[in-house]
Design a protein with these regions (language model features):
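Short, surface-exposed ligand- or partner-binding patches at beta-edge/loop junctions that are enriched
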Residues: 89
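Structural scaffold elements adjacent to functional motifs in cytosolic proteins
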Residues: 45-47
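Rhodanese-like catalytic fold shared by cysteine-dependent sulfurtransferases
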Residues: 2-6, 12-43, 52-85, 94-127
């Protein structure tokens, strides 16, 4: 019987240290992403693709910070206002998901990834 109680105590102790998956709540569909941007004036649209990719076409008013810059990417992020809302995208959604994770680790609280990236973007783009 004591083994049963010990198992319950260990299980509950382990649950204390579990954190919800923050990334699952930061991935937004194109529709929700666009709607949320409108609801947050002053929000920043962040393109984490390379400069060449950015110049080939990007979402209007997007700021380009290349995720592949490594430490330079972190430096540029640290120069941003961590209290703003950030809507992040890349080509397909993979790099932007990584960027959102990095941003949250750096203390940004409102960061959102565009599912499918610019490949699935149906809105306007500029070159």
């Amino acid at each position: 019987m004591w083994k049963f109680y010990l198992s319950i105590v260990l299980l509950l102790t382990g649950c204390i240290y579990l954190k919800p998956n923050q990334n699952s709540m930061s991935d937004l569909s194109q529709k929700d992403w666009a709607k949320s941007i409108v609801e947050h004036p002053g929000a920043v649209v962040l393109d984490v693709r390379t400069e060449d990719e950015f110049e080939s076409g990007h979402i209007p008013n997007a700021l380009n910070i290349d995720l592949r810059k490594g430490p330079g990417f972190i430096d540029e992020l640290n120069a941003l206002d961590k209290n703003k809302f950030y809507y992040v995208y890349c080509r397909s959604g993979a790099r932007s998901a990584q960027a959102v994770k990095v941003m949250r680790d750096l203390g940004f609280s409102e960061t959102y990834n565009l599912i499918g990236g610019i490949l699935e973007w149906e809105g306007q783009t500029v070159e």
